[in-house]
Amino acid sequence: MEHSGILASLILIAVLPQGSPFKIQVTEYEDKVFVTCNTSVMHLDGTVEGWFAKNKTLNLGKGVLDPRGIYLCNGTEQLAKVVSSVQVHYRMCQNCVELDSGTMAGVIFIDLIATLLLALGVYCFAGHETGRPSGAAEVQALLKNEQLYQPLRDREDTQYSRLGGNWPRNKKS
């Protein structure tokens, strides 16, 4: 039993550490993006701007222009059939604002100033009456409550009962 456990661990030790013999790096220098491989890089799909260092470094262009594509790292003489690939998808936020404490303080400060100016404007326009008050407002203030309404006479409760009472009516037959 002990020998089978040792044999299983030797198999795992031999199989697991076998990774890719290639070292693919995606780096950003200044404002450009580069794909670098320790053997040679091959372009399959996407953006390419230029090659450097005997096809070991590939310039993808400016990071602001969102470079993307699939790139292969070719095998060496010993491992000719082995290839390793990397997919690059760069997405830059061109319309973003960095939200730090200074920006937040500025937003809050400007918000308070705008609120105060709005309150001042409402106070100035609503607080003062322009012109003189209307004559109807003065007359109503002088009348007593019982004089506001005229009582109905002779049970004539329709609105237009007294208008044109003596006038002859035109009836067409």
From Swiss-Prot:
Single GO cellular component term: T cell receptor complex
Gene3D superfamilies in the cross-refs: Immunoglobulins, YojJ-like
Record bears the keyword Transmembrane helix: yes
Glycosylated residues in this chain: N38, N55, N74
Residues in ITAM domain copies: 138-166
Chain segments annotated as transmembrane: 106-126
Phosphotyrosine modifications at: Y149, Y160
Cytoplasmic side: 127-173
Main localization (coarse): membrane
Keyword annotations from UniProtKB, A to Z: Adaptive immunity, Disulfide bond, Glycoprotein, Immunity, Membrane, Phosphoprotein, Receptor, Signal, Transmembrane, Transmembrane helix
Phenotype of the disrupted gene, per the record: Thymocyte development in mice lacking CD3D is arrested at the double-positive stage with markedly diminished TCR expression. Thymocytes are defective in the induction of ERK pathway upon TCR engagement, whereas activation of other MAP kinases is unaffected.
PTM section of the record: Phosphorylated on Tyr residues after T-cell receptor triggering by LCK in association with CD4/CD8.
Membrane topology according to the record: Single-pass type I membrane protein
Pfam families: Ig_4, ITAM
Disulfide bonds: C37-C73
Subcellular compartments: Membrane
Keyword Signal assigned: yes
GO biological process annotation, one example: cell surface receptor signaling pathway
Domain of life the protein comes from: Eukaryota
GO molecular function: identical protein binding; transmembrane signaling receptor activity
Stretches in topological domain Extracellular: 22-105
Record-linked InterPro entries: CD3_esu/gsu/dsu, Ig-like_dom_sf, Ig-like_fold, Ig_4, Phos_immunorcpt_sig_ITAM
Signal sequence, start to end: 1-21
Function: Part of the TCR-CD3 complex present on T-lymphocyte cell surface that plays an essential role in adaptive immune response. When antigen presenting cells (APCs) activate T-cell receptor (TCR), TCR-mediated signals are transmitted across the cell membrane by the CD3 chains CD3D, CD3E, CD3G and CD3Z. All CD3 chains contain immunoreceptor tyrosine-based activation motifs (ITAMs) in their cytoplasmic domain. Upon TCR engagement, these motifs become phosphorylated by Src family protein tyrosine kinases LCK and FYN, resulting in the activation of downstream signaling pathways.
Subunit structure of this chain's protein: The TCR-CD3 complex is composed of a CD3D/CD3E and a CD3G/CD3E heterodimers that preferentially associate with TCRalpha and TCRbeta, respectively, to form TCRalpha/CD3E/CD3G and TCRbeta/CD3G/CD3E trimers. In turn, the hexamer interacts with CD3Z homodimer to form the TCR-CD3 complex. Alternatively, TCRalpha and TCRbeta can be replaced by TCRgamma and TCRdelta. Interacts with coreceptors CD4 and CD8.
Name of the protein in its database record: T-cell surface glycoprotein CD3 delta chain
Species this protein is from: Mus musculus
